[in-house]
Structure formats: C-alpha cells, structure tokens
A protein has these predicted regions:
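Active-site-proximal substrate-binding core of FAD-dependent oxidoreductases
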Residues: 47, 194-206
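A conserved FAD-binding loop/helix module that cradles the flavin
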Residues: 163, 168, 173-199
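Flavin-binding catalytic cores
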Residues: 88, 92-149
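FAD-binding beta-loop-beta segment adjacent to the flavin cofactor pocket
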Residues: 88-94, 142-171, 175-177
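Glycine-centered tight beta-turn/hairpin loop motif at sheet-sheet or coil-to-beta transitions
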Residues: 13-15
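A conserved short coil-to-beta-strand element within the FAD-binding core of flavoproteins
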Residues: 1-9
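Generic structural signal for small/hydrophobic residues in well-ordered secondary structure
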Residues: 24-26, 59, 100, 143, ...
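Central helical "cap/lid" subdomain
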Residues: 17-70, 135
Length: 206
C-alpha cells in the first residue's frame, strides 16, 4: 500500500496495481500494522489489542431429529460453543446442520499446525462434539474445518474506528469494540459518521 499526492495505490501479489482517492481497511490489528503502519497515528499504533485465534467446524449429520435447542456454551478444553443451525428455520433439511467453535485455549495450541493435519484435527473435533451431544461419529457425513489466527479481541479499545481526512484513510473492525459480530457493524457505522462529518479534503497534499 502506497500513498501518493492525492491517491492511494495498492499493489497485489501478481503486480497488478489499483488506485483510489480513498482507502478503508477492515482487517485484524496485526495485519493492519503490517500493511499500513507508516500511515497510522501513534494513538492507533499504541492500542492494547490482543487478538485470539479460533477454529470452526461445520458438520452435517444424517438421521436428523428435532432437538429443542439453538446453541450450547461449554467449558471443555476443546469446544466452547455449538450452534444447531436447523433451529434458525432458515431452510428445511432432513439432515442435522451444526457449527462448532473451539475454545481459545485449544485454538492457541493448534492454529499454526491444523492445516498440516487437517484430517486428524477434524476427526478429533468431531469426536469431541459427538461426546457432548450423544451422536455416533458415523452419523457425521460431511465436515469442513477452518481457522482464523486473528479472530477475537475481547477487550474494548479507546477507539471505535479510525478516520484521517487528510489522507482519506479509514479503518474499522470488530476488534476496536470487542469480539461479537455486532461490534463489526458498530465500528463500521462509527467510521461512516466520522467520514460524513469530516469528508476528504480535496486535493490536499500529504
């Protein structure tokens, strides 16, 4: 990412370049500093942000039976949260659809190596789920696992978003405010209000 007189230029891995008058980044804090450190002010650079990883699995279970619950929070070392997707009534399916989220402790231990042993990690995750719910592992007919190295920041920062009208440069993300999906929306809305109040200074050299 480079800033010139009155525009931004982004260079991709394939060397393609894109220019724009304004730039808004929404990415985890460690990646933000790596991409745009020289364009951030001291207040943003000095935020106390600790990002935690998460590993999530999506499962399909045959012989689906109606289960009267929408989600479960657990205190096990491996799984922290289980969602029963069928309970949301967004669609009808004869199959059981589930989403699992790992505990922070287990994700910290496995986030850097799960891709090298995806099959065994996935199998272990499914086994832990079946123990909790009471399913037979053979009933799981599909599963997919994915990890985010920088998934959560549990502590709110002193900022809700960042906007520099001189550079026409903004930043938003859930990590400004917490770990929930709503925090991402709130941060983006806060950035919108800042841009509306202090829009781009046209032709301003920086």
């Amino acid at each position: 990412i480079d800033r010139y007189k009155n525009y931004w230029e982004i260079t991709l891995k394939d060397k393609k370049k894109y220019q724009s008058r304004s730039l808004v980044l929404t990415c985890p804090y460690p990646q933000l500093k790596k991409l745009a450190k020289k364009y951030l002010n001291k207040k943003l650079l000095n935020l106390n942000v600790k990002m935690h990883p998460n590993i999530t699995a999506m499962l399909v279970v045959k012989n689906h039976k109606e289960i009267p619950l929408s989600s479960i929070k657990t205190d096990t070392d491996v799984i922290s949260w289980i969602a029963n997707e069928n309970s949301k009534k967004r669609f009808r399916s004869p199959l059981g659809l589930w989403t699992l989220q790992s505990s922070v402790k287990w994700a910290n231990k496995n986030i850097n190596k799960y891709k090298k042993k995806t099959r065994s990690t996935n199998s272990f995750f499914i086994s832990e789920f079946c123990k909790l719910i009471g399913f037979n592992k053979n009933e799981v007919i599909f599963s997919n696992i994915h990890g985010w190295k920088y998934s959560y920041n549990f502590k709110k920062t002193v900022l809700s978003s960042y906007w520099d009208e001189r550079q026409s440069f903004g930043v938003c993300g859930d990590w400004f405010l917490g770990s929930k999906a709503e925090d991402a929306w709130s941060s983006a809305f806060d950035l919108y209000k800042k841009i509306k109040k202090n829009p781009l200074i046209k032709n301003k050299r920086v």
